Amino acid sequence: MGIQGLLPLLKSIMVPIHIKELEGCIVAVDTYSWLHKGALSCSRELCKGLPTKRHIQYCMHRVNLLRHHGVKPIMVFDGGPLPMKLEQENKRARSRKENLARALEHEANGNSSAAYECYSKAVDISPSIAHELIQVLRQENVDYVVAPYEADAQMAFLAITKQVDAIITEDSDLIPFGCLRIIFKMDKFGHGVEFQASKLPKNKDLSLSGFSSQMLLEMCILSGCDYLQSLPGMGLKRAHALITKFKSYDRVIKHLKYSTVSVPPLYEESFKRALLTFKHQRVYDPNAEDIIHLCDISDNLGEDSDFVGPSMPQDIAKGIALGQLDPFTQLPFQAESVTPKLAVDDISRPKSFKPETVKKKLDLPVQKNLLTKYFCFASVEAKRKFKAPRISPMSLTPTDESPSIPDDNTPDLDALSSQTTNESPVYSLGENPCVSEVAEKRDSPDDDAVERNHKDLHHKYCEREVDRPKSDSLKVIVRSKYFKQKQEDKSLKQSIPCLNDCSVIGQRKAVKTVINMSSASKREESHRAIATSPCLHHDRIYNDHEDAKEASFSAMNEVAERTINTHKINHQINEEEQNPSVEIPSAFSTPENVIPLSSIAIDSCHGVATGKRKLDSDENLHKENLKSKHMRMDETDTALNAETPLETDDVEKFGSNISHIGHYSEIAEKSVERFVSAISSFKYSGTGSRASGLRAPLKDIRNTCPSKGLSLKPDISKFGYASSNRHMVTKSRRM
């Protein structure tokens, strides 16, 4: 604690100093002040009893700094409890206990900054913590001494007896103890401020000229110290004024008793004991290896002198001074810990480099409130029950790439299938329905060749899908209600049974080759690199669609003859299943075209094959403007579809046809007409009321209020002042 506010008042005589100026000197160090500073970095560990050595490293760094500059340190430790300081120690113990409870509460709530502050106030440097540092000092051959009671009195004894040249401390109690040279506020670089008792008369803020050491001591006790609490409203400046005026403490107390200040009845007796404690406290003499008084014993000490420190046997005093006995229990310490040895190794050796990747993940607690108490516990429980998902190979949906049987005569099939893969908007993780169907058809020996071919294709495709990175397959795509219907159509596609006839596959190739040949011939004739303005793009797109229609019609006519064989295969499929309509998104199909299911080539393992015509560089310019068309199939029997001609479907999907844009003008016109008809009911009529509910102004009634411009101006002359001697003035003028 020290003397509150003493060092700031002595700032004018404090001189900056570096410890290299003390080269060749012996200094006594208040070790507990360094331990308290070092404990700030590990206060939580010390309060919880966790192993740490940061406080020891803090002290040893400064010890090595002193020795580096040629200064010999003597480390002085506090000893047992002093009876005069018992009340103050109990008060500090209660404060530490309260701060520890607050620190645990703040830590539980996740408030780390408040918890750190409370831990710093709750940490207590016990004799066991000091004993760890003593073991390191022994290994480093650094001198130390443990005071029987107070380290301040022990350092004052060493300074008065000239065993040390200066004292390094943070406690201002050393000034009233009578120390001549003190170093305050020493940092890790060796900088500090020096106090010299010879400069006290030159102090500016608090004039101490004419003050003796006794008067200075009485002033400090009167303002409040560790041994006696100050009176209400008594500080350093008021104590200085009273001591300056009355010269001694007994006169000051007598003056205070007759003034408005309330003085306790035992205050004067306590003041005497505090004064004797500063002068005659028991300390350890290293030369005599025995316990003695700080100053010579006076006769007024009395028989009860235990308040300056109870007497103890010489062997116990020596054991405490050497750090072998606990100053509180006066018993030997327990087995030595290995922590101090590790601390010495860390001080003398550089720290080994640890990569950042080895560091453990730090889970910071979240501040608790009504919401976090619910969600945080839920998240912890979820973490405990979490199980990593099993990695399974991805399979295809009808929108993915469909493997085709290689054929030299049909090179366009691979190109078309690759185009459909690149333009496919969705990649799903569903299971392949064709795998189970192939397994069910193993009993038929006629389909073994086709079955083996399909197995190889499916195996190659699965290997290709497994090699695909996970990030590509885990794309989340938000779809509108229109695409919801499209997904239902895709699910219907997956339910279509696979056809295992080679003739169907060959027929599909023939259809695609015919379509490709017709579309290629049309492209050579129509699509040429002609520079056109943007306004002509619409006409050109229309022509492209007309060409595509003709190509599709011709292709369907050529395929019509080959569909008869397909009907037989289709009748083998379960008749109870309904034939869903299958969409074939291609550039040459139109919404009016409806083709039978049998005429569509179906892959044996991956559902409906998707055909698209190639786009050359000229067509890529208009790709964004093209309207995507879909061929739809009527939900009727496949045999009927083979015989029925192409039909038109007037109902079009919203996303696949944007022709409704042309009706916007009609919609807008109708909406305006409805708005006008609705608002016309509020039209103002001369006889009726307004829509606002206010009455219309009356045109027949004239305003009878006179205008402001026609108002008569008041005659100001009647308010003028007329003097009583007016007639006398006129007469004088006449004369």
From Swiss-Prot:
CDD domains referenced in this protein's UniProt entry, alphabetically: H3TH_EXO1, PIN_EXO1
Region described as Disordered: spans on this chain: 391-456
InterPro entries: 5-3_exonuclease_C_sf, EXO1_H3TH, HhH2, PIN-like_dom_sf, PIN-like_EXO1, XPG-I_dom, XPG/Rad2, XPG_CS
Region of interest called I-domain, as start-end residue ranges on this chain: 138-230
One GO BP: DNA repair
GO molecular function list: 5'-3' DNA exonuclease activity; DNA binding; endonuclease activity; metal ion binding; SUMO binding
Subcellular location: Nucleus
The protein's enzyme class: hydrolase
Cofactor binding comment, as recorded: Binds 2 magnesium ions per subunit. They probably participate in the reaction catalyzed by the enzyme. May bind an additional third magnesium ion after substrate binding.
Binding-site residues, Mg(2+) 1: 30, 78, 150, 152
Cellular component GO terms held in the UniProt record: nucleus
PANTHER family, A to Z: DNA DAMAGE-INDUCIBLE PROTEIN DIN7-RELATED, FLAP ENDONUCLEASE FAMILY MEMBER
UniProt similarity note: Belongs to the XPG/RAD2 endonuclease family. EXO1 subfamily.
Identification of the protein by name: Exonuclease 1
Species, as recorded: Arabidopsis thaliana (Mouse-ear cress)
Higher taxonomy: Eukaryota, Viridiplantae, Streptophyta, Embryophyta, Tracheophyta
